[in-house]
Amino acid sequence: MKAFLKILMVLVFTSVAHAKNPSTLSKEEEVLQHLQSFSAHFKQVLKNEKPLVYYGVLKAKAPNWALWVYEKPLKKEIYMNDKEVVIYEPNLFQATITPLKDKTDFFTILKRLKKQDDGSFKTTINKTTYRLVFKDGKPFSLEFKDEMNNLVTITFSQAEINPTIADEIFVFKPKDENIDIVHQ
C-alpha cells in the first residue's frame, strides 16, 4: 500500500509540475523566442488627417540593432542600437544623432510581447502600446500610436526569419563628407 501511495504522489506531483510549466509554445511564440535577426520590406502608414505612406526595407539583429531604409516617398536611413539613433537624410545632407533614452528598439519590443486571446501579441513600453500580428508564421504587421497620438501601422512583406546579416550595416558611415552631423 505504501508503494502505491508513493507512486500516486509522484504521478500527482509530476502532473502538477507539468501543468505549471507548459512546454508547448505556439508557432509564433517559438519564432519570437528564437528570433536573432529579421529582414523584410515594409509599408508604414501614419494615420492622421491626411495619411502618410512610406516604403522601405528593415534589417534587424539581436540584441538591439536595426536599420530602417526608407525608399519612398523620401529617402531616409535610421540606424538604431542600444545607445543612440542616427537619422540620415541624404536629401538634406544631414545626419541627426540622438541618445536613446528608452529601450524601444525593435528587439526590445519583440522580446516583451505577450500573446493575447485574439492571437495577436501586445506590450506597452513607456505608455506606448505595440501590437504585432503574425501571418504564415512570420511577423506581418506592427501597430502603435506615436507621441502625437497618430496610429502607425507597419506591414511587413518578404519577411525572413533569422537571415545572416553583417554587423557592419548597422553602423552609420557618412556617404558624403559634406553632410552636417547634428548631435541632440
Q: What is each of the regions a protein language model found here?
A:
Residues 32-50:
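A short, Trp-centered hydrophobic/proline-enriched beta-strand micro-motif
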Residues 10-20:
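Hydrophobic h-region of N-terminal signal peptides that target proteins for export
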Residues 90-127:
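Flexible, surface-exposed loop/linker segments and immediately adjacent secondary-structure boundaries
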Residues 48, 91-93, 148:
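Solvent-exposed strand-loop boundary residues in beta-sheet-rich modules
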Residues 53-105:
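An acidic-aromatic
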Residues 19-27:
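Cleaved targeting-peptide boundary
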Residues 2-10:
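Sec-dependent signal peptide recognition
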Residues 114-184:
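Gly/Pro-enriched, hydrophobic low-complexity segments
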